[in-house]
């Protein structure tokens, strides 16, 4: 199989929600935070149908702020966006058993062949979850937004990760499940991209969306083979 990725790969960046853990963890945290705020407003809990409609619309579009849309439509004003983020933070965890088995296997196989970096918009507690679930021995660089002070899709976050890995865009691949915060900003820097079609990825991506990534995969089972063919080691 011919894949338009870098001929020589020195580093691999990986998102957390979607590639490693189920995005249900984030969705559940958001629901709890929404219900908490709505209770203070004297309103009933969020209707699951309304939540799913907004969430699925964001998945399909692969653009725009999901938190802003939820704040506007379910809390009555987009100004609640920051408050929603603050409220969901303590609930946004990754319980044991929610990691995808193919993710740990990919990290295990790539360890020692490329530099492996977590590059994700996550809370600091994510490091503890990844450590508990066996990823820590294979991670060379911990790019957790709440810790390093950068968030995707900022150019600065990807540049920070490149610097920490001691490599350049043309020898790097980023793995993520969103176009707007993973594929597009990485490609803008010349980083190779692998789009994982689970979690917040659209259930039925369009041909145009699929064409944005160098490689689109349903899961991580084949990714290690693709990268090892091009690994610098």
Model-found features: residue ranges?
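N-terminal helical cap/lid subdomain that shapes the substrate entry/recognition surface
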Residues: 2-108, 112, 127-128
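Asp-based, Mg2+/Mn2+-dependent phosphohydrolase catalytic module
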Residues: 1-12, 82, 104, 108, ...
């Amino acid at each position: 199989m011919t894949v338009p990725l870098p001929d020589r790969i020195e580093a691999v960046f990986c998102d957390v929600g979607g590639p490693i853990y189920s995005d249900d963890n984030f969705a559940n945290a958001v629901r709890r935070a929404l219900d908490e705020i709505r209770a203070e407003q004297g309103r009933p809990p969020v209707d699951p149908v309304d939540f799913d409609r907004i969430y699925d619309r964001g998945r399909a579009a692969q653009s725009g702020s999901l938190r802003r849309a939820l704040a506007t439509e379910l809390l009555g004003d987009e100004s609640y966006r920051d408050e929603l983020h603050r409220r969901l933070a303590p609930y946004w965890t990754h319980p044991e058993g929610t990691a995808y088995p193919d993710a740990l296997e990919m990290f295990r196989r790539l360890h020692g062949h490329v530099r492996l970096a977590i590059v994700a918009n996550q809370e600091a507690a994510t490091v503890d979850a990844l450590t508990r679930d066996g990823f820590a021995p294979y991670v060379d660089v911990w790019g957790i937004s709440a810790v390093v002070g950068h968030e995707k899709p900022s150019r600065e976050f990807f540049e920070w990760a490149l610097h920490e890995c001691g490599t350049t865009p043309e020898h790097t691949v980023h793995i993520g499940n969103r176009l707007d915060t993973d594929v597009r900003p990485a490609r803008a820097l010349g980083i190779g991209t692998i789009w994982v079609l689970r979690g917040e990825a659209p259930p039925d991506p369009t041909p145009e969306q699929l064409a944005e990534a160098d490689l689109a995969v349903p899961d991580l089972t084949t990714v290690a083979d693709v990268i090892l063919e091009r690994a610098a080691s």
